[in-house]
Each structure stands twice: as structure tokens, then as C-alpha cells.
Amino acid sequence: MPSVFFSYSHADEGLRDQLEKQLSMLKRQGVIETWHDRRIGAGEDIHRAIDDHINTDDIILLLVSADFIASDYCYDIEMQRAMERHHSGEAIVIPIILRACDWHHAPFGKLNAVPRDGKPITQWPDIDEAFLQVAKAVREAAGRVTRTASAPPARAAAAATPAASPAPQSLGPRSSNLRLAKSFTQRDKDQFRHDTFEYIARFFENSLKELGERNAGFEGVFRRVDANRFFATIYRDGKDVSRGTAYLGGETWGRGINYVHGETTSSNSSNESLNVEADDQTLFLTSMGMASFGRDRDQKLSQEGAAELLWAILIAPLQGTRY
């Protein structure tokens, strides 16, 4: 059975947990087995345990972020050894882009990264869809390993490598399912909501600017009213063709992030509303689905996904009319 090694920064442990959940079907089917440093037992030599797996596992997942690149251990030790084994054909290295960072110039920058086009997982509207693409890539890589199983095993080749450290004595079989449920306080949710509103504001401001630069005759105007509200307007040849207001909270909609057509300082109406929710691993946003007649209601939205949903409402009048 192909073995999978996670190389990641502990700053990204929450994302690693979510990825491991998406790989559950592969493990249940006996397609792969997984290992990461949280499986190192008490009393085991940490560096030897990692050395054993980085030198012998069949598939190495590089969970890439700015923290991963900044980590001397991840970048200089784990990644460098992984690339050596990849180039020698001993292992398959798959870069998984978790968060936006300058990764194209790294030694793994020429490898085909996932999700599709190397778009960071945290920027996908639906994070589950992004992790599903990763799971499919791991399944395909495991198939390649299985088909070449008649070749000399990677473990034997690695054992002959002088740089490889001796394997620690095994403490016996153990589950990789050691992930524990996380809990989020109301303070966590409030902070996430405010951070998301700031993200949406920046997203709209930049998108309105880019819209005008790309399309002759069009101008996008962003106006920040206060900490909890902004206006967005699109003009064509000086005539307003779409207006929207985004605001936090409100008299009717409670703690949500709300969007309403037109410009208003009132907080008692909404054409779409986003709420902060949590599962046992992460915070995310859900839509009331008012603008899409309920189609988007069940999606777990990232900050970018939430911003894209509201932006789609603002730009919809322009995309339905041929100018």
C-alpha cells in the first residue's frame, strides 16, 4: 500500500486536518496509508522518525504556504530531501498550495501543483471542492505507485542512502485518525466576521479599480462610509448601472454581513446575508441564499468565496446586458 508523508508548517495544522479528512475514503479503501509528525509517540526521536518517513514514503505532500517556505526545517530539510527522491524516481512529490505565497521560484515550482492552476486552497469559494481535487490527485499518484510496485521498492533504495538516519524502533501499529474536535468561542467568530468584512471591502475596492482599467467607458467607485459599511458603484459613460451597499450587523439581520442593492445607510433590509458558522475543525461562512434562490445555502464559503458571491450580485446587471 503506498505511504503518504505530510510535509507542513504547524501554522497550517488546521488545513492539514481538513485535507486528511478528505483522504479518508482512500484510507478506508486501502489505497494509501498516511503519516505526519503528530503520530510520533512519546519517547521517540523526532528527527529520526521524520527521517525514516521522508526517506521511505512513496508520496510526499508539500503543504505550501508562506509559513512552510519560511520554516528552515520544512524547506531546507524535508523539501530538499523530497525533491532529491522525486528526481531519482524514488517518490512522487505533490505541491499543495494552501495559501497565497511566492512558490513558483522554489525547487518544486515546476511541478504540477494542486488544486487546479495552483490556486491556493484558502481562495476557493468552496474549500471542500479544493480539497477534493487534492484527494483525486493523491489517488492518481497512488495508482502510479501501485502499477510500478514490481520495481525495486523505494524503502530499499533509501536504506542504502548514506544520508538516511536509522529507523526508530516501532512502538506498534497506530491509527492516523488522532484529530480532535476544535471549539470556537464567540470571540473567535466575531473576529472572523470582522476580518471577513475587511477582506470583502478590499476585494470590492480592488475589483472595482480593475474593472475600470480593463473595460473602456466603465468606472468603478468604492466609498468607505464607516468601519461597518461601504458603497460600491459601477458607471458606464458616467451613468450608474449598478450600485450596492455592504454592511455589518443590522436591526433585522443580527450579526451577519449583509448586502443590499443601491446605496443606503439603513440596516433593516438585505438582498443577501452571510453568517459565520463552525464545524469541528474550522470557521467558515454560509449564505442565506436569497440572491440565488437557495442554491448557495449549503456551501461552506471561504472569505474569498463570500466576497465573490457578493461581487456577483453587483456585477450581474452588466453581465446580463450586451453593451
Swiss-Prot record:
GO terms for biological process: signal transduction. Gene3D superfamilies: Toll/interleukin-1 receptor homology (TIR) domain. Keywords: Plasmid. It comes from the Bacteria. PROSITE patterns: TIR. It holds the Pfam family TIR_2. InterPro entries: TIR_dom (IPR000157), Toll_tir_struct_dom_sf (IPR035897). Residues 1-142 form the TIR domain. This is Uncharacterized protein y4lF. It comes from Sinorhizobium fredii (strain NBRC 101917 / NGR234).
